[in-house]
């Protein structure tokens, strides 16, 4: 059994299958406003803070007009949040089993997500797992988004653990880079993008799902 005293979870694409929802909402809005958007382009924005992504979209699609690009952003954001509020968001494989295992081992858990707190709270409550986490660190709590390590440093402070005794679980490149920057071991469970070899070598492991995290901790 590894000496892990606390686990930090990303949320989008790791706990919940939200990336697919974000993509579908954006593609639907892009088609409506004749904006050339596809899954390859969406992948470029995975793990990037909302404000940074919106600014980039305005620059990329400036020729379509500021108002049109803003409608594209607002409509896609609104549709995604409608789905979130409805509770129609699937948990990723292994989430419940891993949370139960960590609870049994008395290993505390924190969510550290670039999403906003209301969305995090809604999704966790709908899934019935809000009480499985001792704290939440959200976009409102940091000045600098991932890949800056600030969010994980704050999360670790909630746990009261050393970096060596903490484990970060991430699905996206920016999150992995943030954990590495914080000096915290990180397991990547890729969602829509596989890691580059150089990045993968800097992780504690790259695993297909959260089911395998239990085996990692036990061995």
Model-derived features: where do they sit?
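A short, Lys/Arg-enriched amphipathic alpha-helix followed by its capping loop at the start of a domain
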Residues: 28-33, 97-107
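Asp-based, Mg2+/Mn2+-dependent phosphohydrolase catalytic module
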Residues: 1-5, 100-103, 116-219
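Short helix-capping segments at alpha-helix termini
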Residues: 32-35, 61-65, 105, 128-132, ...
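Active-site neighborhood of HAD-like aspartate-dependent phosphohydrolases
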Residues: 1-44
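Helix-loop "lid/cap" segments that line or gate small-molecule binding pockets
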Residues: 29-30, 49-64, 123, 155-156
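Metal-dependent phosphoesterase signature
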Residues: 36, 58-97, 105
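Hydrophobic/aromatic residues within well-ordered alpha-helical segments
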Residues: 22-25, 46-50, 72-76, 80, ...
